[in-house]
Amino acid sequence: NNAFTIQLLGADNQQQLKNHLNVIRKYVEITDIFVYRTLAKQKPSMTVLYGSFADRRAAQEALKQLPTVLKANKPIVRTAQGIRAEIAQHQSPQ
């Protein structure tokens, strides 16, 4: 399964994430939002994703339909496979 999603933004800390989520939830269903931890420039970060789409075209269309305020952080279309690989790459061994 290689679904697509929209990466809305990354947040460096919990307060920043909370502030962003409070804005995002005004425009899209919170149940369509996913957050995961990763590294950005070798620092811990939380990435916010929106939606799950069957193909790239559907995700790109949804991205075009986002309100301007949600486009402020330059969202991009990503594959679920790419996100899983990123998470696996940045997981620390137990």
Annotate the PLM regions.
Residues A3-L9:
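Active-site-flanking beta-strand signature of metal-NTP-handling nucleotidyl enzymes
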